[in-house]
Amino acid sequence: MIVLLYVTSLAICASGQPRANQAKGESYSPRYICSIPGLPGPPGPPGANGSPGPHGRIGLPGRDGRDGRKGEKGEKGTAGLKGKTGPLGLAGEKGDQGETGKKGPIGPEGEKGEVGPAGPPGPKGDRGDQGDPGLPGVCRCGSIVLKSAFSVGITTSYPEERLPIIFNKVLFNEGEHYNPATGKFICAFPGIYYFSYDITLANKHLAIGLVHNGQYRIRTFDANTGNHDVASGSTVIYLQPEDEVWLEIFFNDQNGLFSDPGWADSLFSGFLLYVDTDYLDSISEDDEL
């Protein structure tokens, strides 16, 4: 279609029709001759501004701009109003013990308490000055006589080791303070006592000792010479009531104690030398009461 219109235009331009007012005999030449377009002319002057057009529609909102740089720290604002107390929170874990606080002020004086129990005895004080002589005492010499004595023998040989030797043959027993069933003397009065033993030995060595409340006071050793021999010992001891004294063999296989009622004895004896004077004074006071 476009090509057809272009060809038609060219044909019209090429036609040589004379002008209507052409004089007779005047040569005719076409007024319009189609040719190749010329070069564009220079731009014309700007035209006058047109009247403003109507406002266009409001466009869609643009995208948010980027965040600006962080500004400088502002001044501290005024304190706000105190808020309401929040709900009670859960109990926390127990903290460490704090440091001891400062001593508080002295409180008011309390009421007087009851008398407490007596305290323990204090240390021994210094010795005081000597007092004035007292009134003459009353002699009670011979008014109180306390007796304790025994002497016993044995009828068997070679007793067991480390046990009280049973001296079952009673020769004398003042006050019955020696017990022939146990072989022990039991103290009845506090005071000074004398003890002795004379032991016949034969066929074995002898190791015998005098015992006071489980402790050896004296020990005697005698060797077997093939003949009969006698081992002796004696001592003085202070005894308290219920103290016990006895004889025993203190070494294994050295129990050579020998007895033959027909011609040889082994003896254990003891007696009270004198009673403790404090004990006598306490007895005298009891008698006066």
Curated annotation (Swiss-Prot):
Residues 38-139 form the Collagen-like domain. Residues 36-134 are annotated as: Disordered. Residues 143-279 form the C1q domain. Transmembrane segments: none annotated. SMART domains: C1Q (SM00110). Residues 63-76, 93-102 have a biased composition (Basic and acidic residues). Gene3D superfamilies: 2.60.120.40. It is found in: Secreted. Residues 1-16 form the signal peptide. Keywords: Collagen, Secreted, Signal. One of its GO terms (cellular component) is extracellular space. One of its GO terms (molecular function) is identical protein binding. Residues 48-61, 78-91 have a biased composition (Low complexity). This is Complement C1q tumor necrosis factor-related protein 7. It comes from Mus musculus.
